């Protein structure tokens, strides 16, 4: 079988995702699609709108054949570790031929060329990167400036301005960089992103961004206006959730629990992997004085620490990453493939995986639980505080979704 992998969050699944899946099938001519999907918390440090089993079900209803969970240690990390965890998982199951991802660039040759530079870090690039960081510039901006300088020295005709400031391009580069890093045989493909850019806050008829859809859901009770933005299956699921008088979980909902943990002297923000240069002191001052997450992030923000990085740190604190050696864990390849759901074709793919995989396949929680899986279990417990439809022990109680 010719199997293609996709790396996703589906928060929530929308028409842009459907377009990506259809184009993926077209350009890779694949027999099946395996999705590696974030669990209950996503890459920007937020809780997912719907639980991971519901999102897996929606993925299966809209073209995916097998959904595997990206462990929380990677799913809530920066693009580098997010991509490393996902690509190492796809490589580890040893049956994936292709990886297809969206990008604003839409040019796989330029993405591969650029990712090779980021992986090898030539001396002049490395020196420029260090100089920009020493000036107090955030890592993402410093890397973009260093790349532009390096490309100019090489007299490249392509304009690299803004390549590294667009969300899907950043992830695309990290996917390819990590495929090089792990010496994978998986062949990368890209689909040019259509419609609104990732951070657009306004609904567009057919291809609204996930950000715009979440923004709308957070501010409106009438979900009918999403009819042109998401497939019918997704809209029905969102309405069902709302009709059961459940509140959609958002990052702001974490703040009360974060403050409670801090005031209880439980854990330590200094132990988190992305905390350095005394930023924890700014965080502690914000927790002492602020009443909302937004107010706290505004107070903590510095030139080097972006809003996303701060939110990610607070999310890590909320789900208990300060209690483990999370930096060591996220630098290791994904240790298992946990099944969230599959259809009949996915069942055939699973048979191939079980014969070929280099990593364990998990469909129910084993007796022996390692630190990575234990964090996933703890993330579900924390998520259940925000989404009342989720039981704290659902990781033990729920079976993979079968469609």
Curated annotation (Swiss-Prot):
Question: Recorded E.C. number(s)?
Answer: 6.3.4.-
Q: Which gene encodes it?
A: tmcAL
**Binding locations of ATP:** 7-20, 102, 168, 193
Write out the catalysed reaction: cytidine(34) in elongator tRNA(Met) + acetate + ATP = N(4)-acetylcytidine(34) in elongator tRNA(Met) + AMP + diphosphate
Q: Which organism is it from?
A: Clostridium tetani (strain Massachusetts / E88)
A single GO CC term, please? cytoplasm
Identify the domain of life: Bacteria
Q: Which UniProt keywords apply?
A: ATP-binding, Cytoplasm, Ligase, Nucleotide-binding, RNA-binding, tRNA processing, tRNA-binding
Q: Does the keyword RNA-binding apply?
A: yes
Which is a GO BP term held by this UniProt record? tRNA modification
Official protein name in the record: tRNA(Met) cytidine acetate ligase
Give one Pfam hit by family name. HIGH_NTase1
The family classification in the record reads:
Belongs to the TmcAL family.
Q: Which HAMAP family match?
A: TmcAL
- InterPro entries, alphabetically? Rossmann-like_a/b/a_fold (IPR014729), tRNA(Met)_cyd_acetate_ligase (IPR008513)
């Amino acid at each position: 079988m010719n199997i293609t992998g996709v790396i996703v969050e589906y928060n929530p699944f929308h028409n842009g995702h459907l377009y990506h899946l259809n184009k993926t099938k077209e350009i890779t001519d694949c027999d099946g699609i395996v999705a590696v999907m974030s669990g209950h918390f996503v890459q920007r440090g937020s809780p997912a709108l719907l639980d991971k089993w519901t999102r897996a079900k929606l993925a299966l209803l809209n073209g995916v054949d097998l959904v595997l969970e990206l462990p929380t240690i990677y799913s809530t990390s920066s693009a580098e570790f997010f991509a490393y965890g996902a690509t190492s998982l796809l490589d580890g199951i040893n049956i994936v031929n292709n990886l297809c991802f969206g990008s604003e660039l839409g040019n796989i040759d330029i993405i591969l060329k650029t990712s090779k530079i980021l992986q090898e870090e030539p001396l002049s690039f490395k020196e420029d990167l260090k100089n920009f960081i020493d000036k107090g510039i955030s890592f993402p901006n410093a890397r973009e400036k260093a790349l532009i300088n390096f490309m100019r020295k090489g007299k490249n005709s392509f304009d690299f301005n803004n390549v590294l400031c667009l969300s899907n391009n950043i992830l695309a580069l990290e996917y390819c960089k990590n495929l090089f890093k792990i010496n994978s045989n998986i062949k990368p493909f890209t689909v040019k992103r259509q419609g609104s850019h990732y951070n657009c806050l306004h609904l567009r008829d057919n291809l609204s961004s996930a950000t715009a859809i979440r923004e709308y859901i957070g501010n409106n009770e009438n979900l009918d206006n999403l009819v042109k933005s998401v497939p019918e299956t997704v809209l029905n699921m969102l309405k069902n959730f709302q009709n059961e008088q459940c509140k959609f979980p958002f990052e702001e909902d974490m703040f009360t629990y974060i403050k409670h943990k801090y005031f209880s002297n439980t854990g330590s923000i200094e132990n988190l992997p992305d905390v350095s240069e005394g930023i924890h002191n700014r965080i502690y001052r914000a927790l002492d004085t602020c009443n909302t997450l937004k107010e706290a992030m505004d107070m903590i923000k510095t030139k080097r620490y972006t809003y996303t990085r701060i939110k990610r740190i607070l999310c890590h604190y909320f789900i208990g990453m300060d209690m483990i050696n999370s930096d060591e864990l996220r630098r290791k390849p994904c240790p298992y493939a946990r099944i969230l759901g599959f259809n009949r074709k996915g069942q055939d793919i699973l048979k191939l995986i079980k014969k070929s995989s280099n990593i364990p396949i998990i469909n129910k929680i084993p007796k022996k639980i390692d630190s990575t899986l234990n964090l996933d279990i703890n993330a579900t417990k924390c998520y259940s505080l925000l989404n009342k439809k989720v039981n704290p022990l659902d990781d033990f109680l729920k079976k993979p979704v079968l469609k």
